């Protein structure tokens, strides 16, 4: 056993001291000689040798098998000899295999080198093609270049030769040379312009002279103004006699004498405010003056109506007695009767939109009602969600907190309604108008809430103290609703309008997009699970308007609902959010959703923009898109899932998470452009 292993083990041959190579070096020499031999040998001959060797091996194997099957003792030497021959053939096959591998390696190397050369030539070709394209563009620019003289409108060639002197036109040269012809035409243009410049100077001097004459005549006319004023003062009796049109203000004051006390106070105070502070405020009196003059006595009390009805029962007439229902209808009409005259206030905003308020006085109820008419300065686009923004019955609701104009402000009216079967004044508001509390204040009326007050006194001081504030609130309400109407038209098309002044509040690239903006009902808002906190805090009322929005990015969908107070933008909108991405997330189960709500609900003052802050809503929605980007890009990626990130991080964040709640950096820092925690 040990002798066989010693025979099989390859002896270690080292280089001798006289410089002869050992066995290892001989093997290396053989390897390299085989590489050189590949270049000399023919692969086809090697292939034929391979086939012959295989055939010889098959023949030797079959002969050995035949000899062994015979079992003759004399055949042992022959079998051993054939084994030796087979080993020689195996050695030949191994050598052929080595040569084939060397050829394969060389073929691969040659292919790789050829591929590299082809790639280099291809790259060089692309560079040359790019240079050719660049040169072609430059050539095109040069060919399309227009000289400055081409923009000058020169006279025609016929006029040039007919008007220009021969020293400039040079017909013997320019008629055959287009270049010289153009130069000569330009010289003639220059000569003409010099002449026109001289004429211009002469005209300016003449203009100055005429202006001086005009100033002298103006001074003369100004000296006539005092004389004309005295003549106008002396002609006042004649104007009254002839009823000249410019005396209409005097007529209006005459008509004001027939106004009831609240409307008269309103007219006087509004006229005074118009003259002193707002000359665009137009105050007018409308209605039937003759009917107003006929009202020489106050309306009869309800007790008198009862006595009259008793007297009618005692009369013996042949006409049919009216039914109880008809009597109640007549009493209701009498109770809700308006004064024949009314006062209209026309408020004009800077952009040209007008808000016309018509004030009526209900004589038996002793209250003022208002009807509204809106005239925008521009054509409004159709927006479904903006349907109620400019509704005359809703636009002035809650101008002051809690004043929706649906109930009467006079406590005495409740007892009057009970007698004639009127359940609520809201059933007649469309016909009579809204009895807002601020309307009573503008008319000098004040009704205490603790006890009925059948008698009223119109106070001028009360009206004057509230006039300016109310007028400003009315204008602000109209402007805010018009601004919201334009914003809603853009939001319904998925576009968030952001002004230039507010673009610094957001990064240049916001990927999340608004895909839905609709109006929803108050009941639908209450049914949403993620609006519970807002409802419990009393921030959602029936007088508010409610909208839903959807912001998407990839598979993430951010649903939100908005509470829009009538007093927008003094009272900011309130947002409630719910994110549908890998489950449903709201402020109740994800602290970062609560932080996103705080960014738009608590820090809204950063988004108001330039006064009066009508862009607050759109800026809040744009911030929500930005916050959704930060939320998704800072979310931890699942490393077990192969492939690229769905939301690759593109925002610069100083710190991704902070605190035990693991809040994300939602605050945008301008102009540095990074996000941080608050």
Swiss-Prot record:
<dbReference type="GO" id="GO:0003729">
    <property type="term" value="F:mRNA binding"/>
</dbReference>
<keyword id="KW-0813">Transport</keyword>
<comment type="subunit">
    <text>Component of the THO subcomplex, which is composed of thoc1, thoc2, thoc3, thoc5, thoc6 and thoc7. Component of the transcription/export (TREX) complex at least composed of alyref/thoc4, ddx39b, sarnp/cip29, chtop and the THO subcomplex. Interacts with thoc7.</text>
</comment>
<dbReference type="GO" id="GO:0030154">
    <property type="term" value="P:cell differentiation"/>
</dbReference>
<protein>
    <recommendedName>
        <fullName>THO complex subunit 5 homolog B</fullName>
    </recommendedName>
</protein>
<keyword id="KW-0539">Nucleus</keyword>
<feature type="region of interest" description="Disordered">
    <location>
        <begin position="294"/>
        <end position="329"/>
    </location>
</feature>
<keyword id="KW-0509">mRNA transport</keyword>
<dbReference type="GO" id="GO:0006406">
    <property type="term" value="P:mRNA export from nucleus"/>
</dbReference>
<feature type="compositionally biased region" description="Basic and acidic residues">
    <location>
        <begin position="14"/>
        <end position="37"/>
    </location>
</feature>
<dbReference type="GO" id="GO:0006397">
    <property type="term" value="P:mRNA processing"/>
</dbReference>
<keyword id="KW-0694">RNA-binding</keyword>
<dbReference type="GO" id="GO:0000445">
    <property type="term" value="C:THO complex part of transcription export complex"/>
</dbReference>
<dbReference type="Pfam" id="PF09766">
    <property type="entry name" value="FmiP_Thoc5"/>
</dbReference>
<dbReference type="GO" id="GO:0016607">
    <property type="term" value="C:nuclear speck"/>
</dbReference>
<feature type="short sequence motif" description="Nuclear localization signal">
    <location>
        <begin position="7"/>
        <end position="10"/>
    </location>
</feature>
<keyword id="KW-0507">mRNA processing</keyword>
<dbReference type="InterPro" id="IPR019163">
    <property type="entry name" value="THO_Thoc5"/>
</dbReference>
<keyword id="KW-0221">Differentiation</keyword>
<comment type="function">
    <text>Component of the THO subcomplex of the TREX complex which is thought to couple mRNA transcription, processing and nuclear export, and which specifically associates with spliced mRNA and not with unspliced pre-mRNA. Plays a key structural role in the oligomerization of the THO-ddx39b complex.</text>
</comment>
<dbReference type="GO" id="GO:0005737">
    <property type="term" value="C:cytoplasm"/>
</dbReference>
<keyword id="KW-0963">Cytoplasm</keyword>
<comment type="similarity">
    <text>Belongs to the THOC5 family.</text>
</comment>
<keyword id="KW-0508">mRNA splicing</keyword>
<feature type="compositionally biased region" description="Acidic residues">
    <location>
        <begin position="301"/>
        <end position="314"/>
    </location>
</feature>
<dbReference type="GO" id="GO:0008380">
    <property type="term" value="P:RNA splicing"/>
</dbReference>
<feature type="region of interest" description="Disordered">
    <location>
        <begin position="1"/>
        <end position="37"/>
    </location>
</feature>
């Amino acid at each position: 056993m040990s002798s066989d292993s010693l025979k099989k083990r390859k002896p270690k041959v080292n280089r001798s001291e006289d410089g002869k190579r050992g066995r290892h070096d001989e093997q290396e020499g053989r390897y390299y000689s085989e590489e050189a031999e590949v270049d000399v040998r023919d692969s086809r001959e090697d292939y034929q040798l391979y086939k012959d060797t295989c055939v010889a091996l098959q023949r030797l194997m079959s002969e050995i098998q035949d000899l062994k099957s015979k079992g003759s003792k004399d055949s042992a030497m022959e079998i051993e000899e054939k084994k030796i021959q087979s080993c020689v053939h195996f050695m030949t096959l191994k050598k052929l295999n080595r040569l084939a591998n060397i050829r394969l390696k060389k073929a691969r190397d040659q292919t790789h080198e050829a591929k590299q050369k082809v790639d280099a030539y291809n790259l060089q070709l692309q560079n040359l093609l790019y240079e050719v394209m660049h040169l072609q563009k430059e050539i095109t620019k040069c060919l399309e270049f227009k000289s400055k003289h081409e923009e000058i409108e020169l006279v025609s060639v016929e006029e040039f030769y007919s008007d220009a002197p021969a020293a400039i036109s040079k017909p013997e040269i320019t008629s055959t040379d287009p270049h010289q012809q153009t130069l000569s035409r330009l010289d003639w243009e220059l000569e003409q312009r010099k002449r026109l410049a001289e004429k211009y100077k002469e005209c300016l001097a003449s203009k100055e002279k005429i202006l001086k004459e005009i100033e002298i005549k103006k001074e003369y006319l100004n000296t006539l103004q005092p004389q004309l004023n005295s003549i106008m003062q002396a002609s006042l009796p004649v104007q009254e006699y002839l009823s000249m049109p410019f005396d209409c203000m005097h007529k209006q004051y005459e008509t004001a004498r027939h106004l009831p006390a609240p409307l008269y106070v309103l007219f006087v105070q509004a006229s005074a405010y118009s003259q002193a502070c707002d000359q665009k405020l137009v105050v007018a009196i409308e209605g039937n003056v003759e009917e107003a003059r006929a009202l020489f006595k106050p309306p009869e009390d309800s007790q008198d109506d009862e006595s009259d009805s008793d007297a009618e029962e005692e009369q013996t007439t042949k006409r049919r007695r009216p039914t109880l229902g008809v009597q109640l209808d007549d009493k209701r009409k009498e109770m809700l009767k308006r004064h024949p005259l009314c006062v209209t206030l026309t408020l004009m905003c800077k952009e040209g939109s007008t808000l016309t308020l018509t004030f009526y006085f209900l004589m038996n109820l002793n209250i003022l009602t208002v009807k509204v008419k809106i005239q925008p300065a521009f054509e409004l686009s159709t927006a479904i969600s903006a349907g109620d923004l400019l509704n005359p019955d809703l636009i002035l609701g809650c101008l002051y907190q809690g004043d929706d104009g649906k109930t009467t402000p006079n406590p005495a009216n409740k007892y009057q309604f009970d007698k004639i079967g009127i359940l609520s004044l809201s059933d007649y508001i469309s016909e009579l108008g809204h009895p807002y509390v601020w309307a009573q204040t503008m008319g000098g009326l004040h009704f205490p809430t603790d006890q009925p007050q059948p008698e009223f006194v119109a106070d001028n001081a009360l009206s004057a103290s509230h006039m300016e504030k109310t007028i400003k609130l009315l204008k602000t309400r109209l402007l805010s609703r018009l601004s919201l109407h334009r914003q809603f038209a853009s939001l319904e098309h998925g576009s968030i309008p952001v002004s230039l002044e507010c673009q610094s509040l957001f990064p240049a690239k916001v990927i999340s997009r608004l895909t839905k903006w609709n109006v929803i009902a108050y009941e639908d808002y209450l049914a949403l699970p993620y609006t519970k906190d807002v409802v419990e805090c009393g921030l959602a009322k029936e007088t508010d308007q409610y909208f839903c929005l959807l912001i998407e990015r990839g598979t993430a969908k951010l649903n939100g609902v908005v509470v829009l107070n009538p007093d927008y933008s003094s009272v900011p909108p309130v947002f409630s959010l719910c994110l549908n991405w890998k489950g449903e997330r709201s402020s109740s189960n994800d602290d970062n959703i609560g932080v996103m709500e705080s960014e738009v609900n608590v820090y809204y003052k950063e988004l108001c923009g330039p006064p009066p802050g009508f862009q607050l809503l759109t800026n809040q929605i744009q911030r929500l898109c930005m916050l959704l980007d930060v939320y998704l890009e800072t979310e931890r990626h699942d490393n077990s899932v192969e492939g690229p990130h769905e939301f690759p991080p593109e925002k610069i964040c100083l710190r991704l998470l902070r605190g035990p709640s693991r809040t994300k950096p939602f605050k945008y820092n301008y102009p540095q452009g990074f996000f941080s925690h608050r």
